[in-house]
Structures are given as C-alpha cells and as structure tokens.
C-alpha cells in the first residue's frame, strides 16, 4: 500500500524543510524525524518525532515548548493549507535522555 | 461537566505515576483517559442544548461517533467545514485548537490502547494531558459560539 502521494522530489523538499524548521530551534530541538503512513482508521498521515533537549524540557512549560515547535512546522510546511494538507499531522516528543535510554531506531 | 473534568484530573494523575507503580500501564491509561475527557466534554455540551429527557440525552450521547468527530475536526483545521446556518459562522481560533487536539489525542489513544509494541515515556503522557487541558480551556472560552454549537451538532 502506498503511504504517500508525493514524488521523490517533493519528499526530498519536504525533508529539507523539516530540517530547516528544526534549525529554528537550536536550543530546544536536537532533530526532527518524520514518516508518511496511515493513521488508525486509514487516513494518510505524517508522524513527526521531535527530539527535544533535556535543557529545553526543563526550562520551558511543556505546552509552550511543544506549541512553538508545532506552530513552526504547521506554518512553515503549510500542513493545513498546502499539498501536504491531505496528510493529518501527528506530533510526538522525546527528550534526548529518553532516546539515549530507549535507542529507538525511528528516532535516530 | 463533572465526568469530563474528573477524567482529566485522573489523566493528569496517571501521567506521573508514583514510584513502584507500573509506568507503561499508567502512561497508556493517562493518554487514553485524556482523550475520553475531551470526548465527553464535547459530547455533553452538544446534548445539553437538546430538549429531551435526561434518559434520552444519555441515549443521544451514545450516538456520537469517534470517526465522524475526527472528520469534522479535520475539516475545521483545513477551513473546509461549513455549518448549517447561512452564512456559515466564522471559526474562532480556539475551535481550531480544540479540533487539533481532538484529532491528535484520538490517534494517541488508539496507539496507547492497542499498540503494545510502543514504549511510552513520561513526556508522552504529560504532553497529551497538557494538550487536553489546553483544549478544555479553549472550549470553555467558545462553548456558546455558533461555530462550536454547529460543529457539535454535525458530529
């Protein structure tokens, strides 16, 4: 089953733009990974896996931190207004310490 | 709104399990409970305005479908939602926040309840509960807004 309707070039552009958003938060974000898939009832979806610094997680209230990052992704990628709007975005967060412990390949 | 607020309180407690309590089960129940807190908040508000007996209202509450509520939420986020009144009410930003959290929590709830391969961490549960709290705050600001009333009646 196809998990994306985007061309290889679109996927490459999308990945580059995701990295650019991550760079806007140098003190808060270690990296952002993403994948195209289907959600629980089969709708096209983008899953963002956002690795945040331990310092940011302690310094900011979590809703403020995650809200700023999500707003950045939604606005800069046009997640509800562009060709990507067919995909439902889902956002998940981990701290670097969590990932160092879990070593989850999807988050590397 | 007692049940919705009680569920939110419970979700918050489960997000920070005491030492010795099962972490994975607590995080999963926290996320699932946060979703149901928001679900019941919206459903109860929707049926409040319906002039039936309390028994009939409870029956009506059971008719709300998760998938349709997700579809309505997604159409709100993509500015494609239209209410039943003409002209269609302007969608306030607060309603978009509620819609965004609802969709996100519903997916997280499915994973929390059924994906046993996924390992959850504290930030997952705390983040989802915080999102639910944000949705409660935003909903309480606009619960009587025409767009809020009409989107609930479409679910």
Per-segment meaning from a language model:
Chain B
Residues 1-155:
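Terminal alpha-helical segments
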